[in-house]
A protein has these predicted regions:
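Class II aminoacyl-tRNA synthetase-like tRNA-binding/catalytic domains
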Residues: 1-110
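Alpha-helical packing segments of well-folded alpha/beta enzyme cores
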Residues: 13-17, 116, 123
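Extended, domain-scale alpha-helical bundle/helix-rich regions
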Residues: 111-115
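Metal-assisted phosphate- and nucleotidyl-transfer catalytic regions
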Residues: 117-145
Length: 145
């Protein structure tokens, strides 16, 4: 069962992330209401559905595809971000790793992988994360998991 995230901590964190991206001239997009299979671009076996206006739709897992669409249709934007709720139907959720419903803050921007990594480092600095020996841990995704 989900428990409520501390509202003060949630608000503080989300507002700080919003400030970071707004200062970079990113535009916030609302993706939660978009009804499309694009909202379920993670693992198709973990999709939950709902019925709306006589059709079955996937509950959104991510706003990623919509954010990419916003950038493609607005090339003058530096980037875009959204805050949404992700719904997952993990068959074997691992406690502490797989929540079935959770808030998600996502962003998309122009650039390459180095640009993305640099932005993530800037965001971690902005949020006040501590570095170890002057940097953040790095590694191959599969090794870290």
């Amino acid at each position: 069962m989900n428990k409520m995230i501390n509202p003060r901590k949630f608000s503080g964190c989300v507002n700080k992330m919003r400030q970071f991206f707004l200062q970079k001239n990113f535009v916030e997009a609302h993706t939660q209401n978009m009804r499309s299979i694009l909202a379920a671009c993670e693992d198709p076996k973990t999709i939950s559905t709902y019925q709306y206006a006589g059709q079955v739709w996937p509950l959104p897992q991510t706003g990623q595809m919509w954010l990419e669409n916003v950038l493609l249709n607005n090339p003058d934007y530096e980037g875009t971000f959204c805050l949404s709720t992700s719904y997952r139907n993990e068959p074997n959720p691992v406690p502490g790793r797989h929540d079935l419903m959770f808030p998600m803050f996502e962003f998309e921007s122009k650039g390459n992988m180095n640009d993305m990594q640099n932005m993530q480092i800037e965001l971690l600095d902005y949020l006040g994360f501590e570095k170890t020996n002057g940097s953040y841990p790095e590694g191959d995704y599969l090794d870290i998991c």
